Each structure stands twice: as C-alpha cells, then as structure tokens.
C-alpha cells in the first residue's frame, strides 16, 4: 500500500474515531505497519492541514490524534449554531409560523382567531429567529402590525419562493395549517 492510500485510510480513521481520537498504536494495528511510520505519516498530515485551504487540523491530546476545527474559523461555526431550525421551535411557534406563511400579511389578532390562543410568545420567538418580520400596518382601528415571512424562512425550510409552499386544497382547509405545512415539508425533503 502506498503512502497516499495510507494517508487516506488514516484520515478516515481519524474521522470515525470522533472526539475520542485514535492512538498511533491503533492505527499501526489497522494498517499493519510500524508505529514510528504511523507517527511520520501523522506529522506529514498535520503539516498538510496547516494550509489556509484546509478547514480541519489534526491535533494530539493525551497520546491520541483527532480532527479539530481551526480556531480562526470559530466565528463561522458559531453562525451555524445560531441558524434556527424547525426542531428548535415550539409547537406553538410552528403553528403560528404556518399560519403566517399561508395567510400573510396577517395581524396578531387574526392569528389568535385561527389558533384560538394568544400568540405573543410564539411571535417573539419567530421574530427573534428572523423567520417572520413586520410587513407594515393594517388599515383600521389601532393600525395593527402585519406580519409576513422572511428570506431566512425560505432558506430554513428549503423553499425558493412562497409559491413552493404546498397548496391548501378545499378539503384540507379545515385541517390544522401547521400539520399540512410540516407534512408537506417532509414530502419536499424526501
């Protein structure tokens, strides 16, 4: 087996060993080579990963090697963590989001009439996750705020435009819009 293939296998071993890492001795047993040769290969791989074109580095902790992300990219990893997902939203927020998606622009009062309960907390959550925003004000007493979905909403749910929302058929209009919306999203993502 040549050096390139050995590096490829070691790279895979580092990946599957995860945060626990893997010792040079374990790698040597898998590849059936000497431990000193494994250390030489790991050192070569560490140098190769140091370049700016690589997002991972190979680090050694407590006699094991493992992959780690580069510290200089930490702000990007934090952005990923901060991206809202449907899983991080409560059922109330998801139901409210479905109502906004299908009925926008819509006021808080209209949402509460559809849901039958207050939507203040759900609206706060959706606005803070940048999934909905104020679209303007409705005409009429008090000029209530109108809400609509955002580009982040489309990105989060893998939609190009609002036209990609599954249509509501007449028989389904009696069903819960949130159930229809998220059931349809599951179909889209298959």
UniProtKB/Swiss-Prot annotation:
| Compartment list | Cytoplasm
Q: Which family does it belong to?
A: Belongs to the ScpB family.
Gene responsible for this protein? scpB
Q: Name one GO cellular component term.
A: cytoplasm
> Which controlled-vocabulary keywords does the entry list?
Cell cycle, Cell division, Chromosome partition, Cytoplasm
| TM region positions | none
Q: What does this protein do?
A: Participates in chromosomal partition during cell division. May act via the formation of a condensin-like complex containing Smc and ScpA that pull DNA away from mid-cell into both cell halves.
Relate the assembly described in the record.
Answer: Homodimer. Homodimerization may be required to stabilize the binding of ScpA to the Smc head domains. Component of a cohesin-like complex composed of ScpA, ScpB and the Smc homodimer, in which ScpA and ScpB bind to the head domain of Smc. The presence of the three proteins is required for the association of the complex with DNA.
BP-aspect Gene Ontology terms:
cell division; chromosome separation; DNA replication
In its UniProt entry, what is this protein called?
Answer: Segregation and condensation protein B
Q: Which Pfam family is an annotated match for this chain, by its short name?
A: SMC_ScpB
InterPro entries, from UniProt? Answer: ScpB_csome_segregation, WH-like_DNA-bd_sf, WH_DNA-bd_sf
């Amino acid at each position: 087996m040549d050096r390139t293939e050995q590096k490829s296998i070691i790279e895979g071993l580092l990946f599957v060993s995860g945060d626990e890492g893997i010792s040079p001795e374990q790698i040597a047993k898998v590849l059936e080579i000497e431990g000193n040769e494994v250390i030489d290969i790991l050192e070569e791989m560490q140098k190769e990963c140091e370049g700016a074109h690589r997002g991972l580095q190979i680090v050694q902790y407590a006699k094991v090697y493992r992959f780690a992300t580069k510290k200089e990219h930490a702000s990007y990893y934090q952005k990923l963590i901060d991206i809202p997902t449907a899983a991080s939203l409560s059922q109330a927020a998801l139901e409210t989001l479905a109502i906004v998606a299908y009925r926008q622009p819509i006021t808080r009062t209209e949402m509460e009439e559809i849901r039958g309960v207050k939507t203040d907390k759900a609206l706060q959550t959706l606005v803070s996750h940048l999934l909905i925003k104020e679209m303007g004000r409705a005409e009429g007493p008090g000029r209530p705020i109108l809400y609509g979905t955002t580009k982040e909403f489309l990105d989060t749910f893998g939609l190009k435009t609002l036209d990609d929302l599954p249509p509501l058929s007449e028989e389904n209009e009696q069903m819960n819009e949130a159930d229809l919306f998220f059931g349809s999203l599951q179909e889209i993502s298959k």
